[in-house]
């Protein structure tokens, strides 16, 4: 049997055409479902996440609030609002939304971790320790910190301190006499990241 016979086989030609048509239909459906048929709260949430990662916190806050208007029971959306307020230095609103996220899902460890970061930024170290411990009790994976792939994608050249690192440091400092404590070092504190899941 020669190659020319295979190419002129009508069944082979029909099967190839059917395969191409099915591939195009399936790809079209996937694109439609992914981009067009996506619920509005998910669209706003993803836009907010991208803006947050690009450090455009006012845009992220606006989109998280839009997502929240469609889905007020999603802990991820609520916690995103709180993180945006935290980065915009609005302590009271950030605290309000972190507490709302925790009340919505009491097992959502990033809300506790980021609430600890909020207290840490505001120099309330005892509450920071408390919420870091709660976050680590719920999810030990938070002690690992930023994954190397994320560091590569977001061009983070040095490994930022984790909440476990910060927790140990704060606890060690609390053991010292008050006049010997160094609880805040701006260069290190500024490297501390927000936690996502």
Task: Name every feature range the model reports, one short phrase each.
Residues 2-15, 144-197:
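Terminal, low-structured helical/coil segments at or just beyond the last alpha-helical repeat
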Residues 36-73, 80:
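Alpha-helical segment of the N-proximal tetratricopeptide repeat
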Residues 46, 80, 114, 148-149, ...:
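Canonical tetratricopeptide repeat
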Residues 53-54, 87, 121, 155, ...:
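Register position in tetratricopeptide repeats
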């Amino acid at each position: 049997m020669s190659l020319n016979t295979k190419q002129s086989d009508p069944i082979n030609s029909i099967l190839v055409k059917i395969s191409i048509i099915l591939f195009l239909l399936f790809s079209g459906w996937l694109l439609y479902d992914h981009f067009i048929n996506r619920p509005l709260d998910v669209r706003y949430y993803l836009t907010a996440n991208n803006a947050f990662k690009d450090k455009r916190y006012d845009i992220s806050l606006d989109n998280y609030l839009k997502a929240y208007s469609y889905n007020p029971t999603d802990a991820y959306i609520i916690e995103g609002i709180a993180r945006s307020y935290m980065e915009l230095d609005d302590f009271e609103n950030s605290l309000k939304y972190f507490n709302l996220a925790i009340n919505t899902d009491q097992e959502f460890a990033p809300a506790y971790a980021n609430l600890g970061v909020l207290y840490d930024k505001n120099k309330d170290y005892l509450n920071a320790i408390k919420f870091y411990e709660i976050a680590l009790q719920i999810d030990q994976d938070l002690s690992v910190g930023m994954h190397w792939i994320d560091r590569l994608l977001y061009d983070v050249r040095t490994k930022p301190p984790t909440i476990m690192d910060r927790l140990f440091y704060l606890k060690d400092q609390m053991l010292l006499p008050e006049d010997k404590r160094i609880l805040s070092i701006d260069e290190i504190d500024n490297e501390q990241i927000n936690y996502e899941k």
